[in-house]
């Protein structure tokens, strides 16, 4: 890297150790969120965050992440290398301090890093504590330094193992089987999505991810390289690739307001949904916060002022609301904050008050300039806002109908709902079943103490293509709202989902195991993602997995959920075995449906969660939206994985 910023010395004296490691192995979830799939991947993010911090300081422009054959991870950067000199206070190498003390690192020394990433901010020492083995290799001062640890403890002092003119840090770690008992298998897709996101958020950095467990047809290991020259502008194009823009190009700005670095990029499209993605120091703030509030304030006030002065609102008979300015808007807000304060349920809501005015001012200035210089686009945006206001007005009446019907007790429940007798929502589950015939079988097969059945007639409305009032007028969707007991509107937000009277804590989508069933599942999931995302985020949405085959021979029978499983059973049963392919739930009798799909002791339910909101938004838009080419490309790319009924 270049010599710029070298005046800020990064040495052993920059390292501050805040506390010991005692708690990490005993209470890992306090440090990395959980010890399941998310926590496992979070280890990688913590190590990569160190490299990103170097990049933010201008010291690093290449980061490489490798999933090794044994599911260990190697990360490498071309930064300055972690200091290796003796730490004054601790009396050991600064590298050992960084690797073995929680919170130790240059990110707590304001001269070394102005801002720093990492949601939990626990750093690489936490990764070390939760790894059965970790080796840190540092390229610095013309030498190669190395130290190996087991479960957070150094096996020997830092030693030199060679000479090199390179600079940087290389870390290889293997998660500890004693901690990660659920899985230690890394998902290439999950890591790849995060690396792509980081490349967009930090333009000019080359990030490579390689999977040494899998080879391409060329014989090379599976690998991708991400480099974004335009940052958020390219990120918007990526997120909106399957939507049709209504303005000529992305509106973007980058600068500093009141000491807060702010980056914003936005575009309007023909969709009816609002897609705002906010980041603080590269962390995706799902719950929003002061930066998002500042964006909304700046957007609404500037567009309202322009719309009023343009005369285009003169014939409108009702007030424009803030939501109207955000329909069909895709925007990314990224801020860098020296000492972020996180709040909210998952600590992903920014609380720093000074950020609101900084973002609001930045957005106002950006939009004022853009609207002045692009009058045609300005007019298009205002017309879109007017249409949104008219649709909102119509949707309000439809929403009130849903509200009234839902609030009614007893008699307000849909006629088709076969309810359960249990009153405690935490113990209750409802199955959303496709079609009346399958619904009938499910009603006979269920345990009516705690299992309710709501049959859905055919394919529900594709909400991705529908205006809001059409969604609330749709009978099947109204039945879902009413059956679940979910209402719209809280004290804080008239449009927010109110889960206070949710009647079931397991909402199970149960569709046929064929192409039509998958389509219906996707339609229902699209509805939940766009209109009831809180249910997904709270862990209430599940997908049932009915078997694909019944394999029989004489009195012996067993079920198969995949072709491989079917083949194994046929081999096990020997010649004379027969196979029945279940194309629909209705082909099973009530006892079979209970045994395979509904019995809590035997069934497999897949919980629906959102790892990456931006990617989920992009995929729903691509699969269910208007644009055909991206969908065709996706299907061609993934056809190999599909189980298609002909």
Spans of model-derived segments:
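Short conserved segment of the HATPase_c
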Residues: 82-104
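Conserved short strand/loop->alpha-helix "switch" segment adjacent to the catalytic nucleotide/phosphoryl-transfer site
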Residues: 26-45
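GHKL-family ATPase ATP-binding module
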Residues: 1-14, 21, 43-45, 53-55, ...
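Conserved, non-catalytic sequence blocks in retroelement Pol enzymes and Pol-derived host proteins
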Residues: 85-90, 291, 322, 469
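Residues immediately C-terminal
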Residues: 53-54, 81-82, 515-516
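C-terminal interaction appendages of subunits in large macromolecular complexes
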Residues: 390-409, 424-429, 440, 444-446, ...
């Amino acid at each position: 890297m270049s010599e710029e910023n070298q005046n800020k010395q990064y040495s052993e004296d920059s390292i501050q150790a805040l506390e010991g490691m005692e708690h990490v192995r005993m209470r890992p979830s306090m440090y990395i969120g959980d010890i399941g799939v998310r926590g496992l991947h979070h280890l990688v993010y913590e190590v990569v965050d160190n490299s990103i911090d170097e990049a933010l300081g201008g010291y690093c422009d290449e980061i490489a992440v490798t999933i090794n054959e044994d599911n260990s991870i190697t990360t490498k950067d071309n930064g300055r290398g972690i200091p290796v000199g003796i730490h004054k206070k601790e009396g050991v190498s600064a590298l050992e301090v960084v690797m073995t003390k929680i919170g130790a690192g240059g990110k707590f020394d304001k001269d070394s890093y102005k801002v720093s990433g990492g949601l939990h901010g626990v750093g690489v020492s936490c990764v070390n504590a939760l790894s059965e083995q970790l080796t840190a290799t540092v390229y610095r001062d013309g030498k190669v330094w190395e130290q190996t640890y087991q479960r957070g403890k150094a096996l020997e002092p830092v030693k030199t193992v060679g000479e090199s003119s390179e600079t940087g840090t290389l870390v290889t770690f293997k998660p500890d089987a004693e901690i990660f008992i659920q899985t230690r298998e890394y998902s290439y897709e999950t890591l790849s999505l995060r690396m792509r996101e980081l490349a967009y958020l930090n333009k000019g950095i080359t990030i490579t991810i390689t999977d040494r467990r899998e080879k391409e047809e060329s014989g090379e290991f599976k690998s991708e390289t991400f480099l974004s020259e335009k940052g958020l502008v390219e990120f918007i194009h990526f997120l909106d690739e399957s939507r049709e823009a209504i303005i000529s190009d992305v509106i973007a700005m980058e600068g500093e307001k009141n000491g807060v670095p702010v980056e914003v990029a936005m575009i309007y499209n023909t969709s009816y949904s609002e897609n705002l993605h906010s980041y603080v120091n590269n962390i995706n703030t799902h719950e929003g916060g002061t930066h998002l509030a500042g964006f909304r304030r700046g957007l609404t006030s500037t567009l309202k002022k322009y719309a009023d002065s343009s005369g285009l609102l003169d014939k409108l008979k009702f007030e424009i609301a803030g939501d109207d300015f955000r329909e069909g808007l895709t925007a990314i807000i990224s801020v860098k904050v020296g000492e972020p304060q996180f709040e909210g349920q998952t600590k992903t809501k920014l609380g720093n008050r000074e950020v609101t005015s900084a973002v609001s001012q930045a957005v106002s200035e950006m939009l004022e300039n853009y609207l002045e210089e692009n009058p045609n686009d300005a007019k298009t945006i205002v017309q879109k806002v007017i249409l949104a206001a008219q649709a909102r007005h119509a949707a309000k009446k439809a929403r009130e109908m849903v509200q009234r019907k839902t609030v009614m007790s007893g008699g307000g429940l849909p006629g088709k709902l076969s309810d359960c007798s249990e009153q405690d929502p935490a113990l209750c589950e409802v199955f959303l079943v496709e079609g009346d015939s399958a619904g009938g079988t499910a009603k006979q097969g269920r345990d009516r103490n705690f299992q309710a059945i709501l049959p859905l007639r055919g394919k529900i409305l594709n909400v991705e293509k529908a205006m809001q009032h059409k969604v609330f007028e749709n009978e099947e969707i109204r039945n879902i709202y009413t059956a679940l007991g979910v209402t719209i509107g809280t004290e804080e937000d008239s449009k927010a989902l109110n889960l206070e009277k949710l009647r079931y804590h397991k909402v199970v989508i149960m569709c046929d195991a064929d192409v039509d069933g998958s389509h219906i599942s996707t339609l229902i999931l699209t509805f939940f993602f766009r209109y009831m995302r809180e249910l997904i985020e709270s862990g209430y949405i599940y997908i049932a997995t009915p078997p694909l085959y019944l394999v029989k021979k004489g009195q012996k029978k067993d079920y198969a959920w995949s072709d491989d499983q079917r083949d194994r059973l046929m081999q096990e049963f020997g010649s004379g075995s027969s196979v029945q392919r279940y194309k629909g739930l209705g082909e099973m009798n009530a006892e079979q449906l209970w045994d395979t799909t509904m019995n809590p002791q035997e069934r497999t339910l897949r919980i629906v969660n959102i790892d990456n909101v931006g990617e989920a938004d992009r995929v729903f838009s691509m699969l269910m939206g208007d644009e055909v080419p991206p969908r065709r490309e996706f299907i061609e790319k993934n056809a190999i994985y599909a189980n298609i009924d002909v």
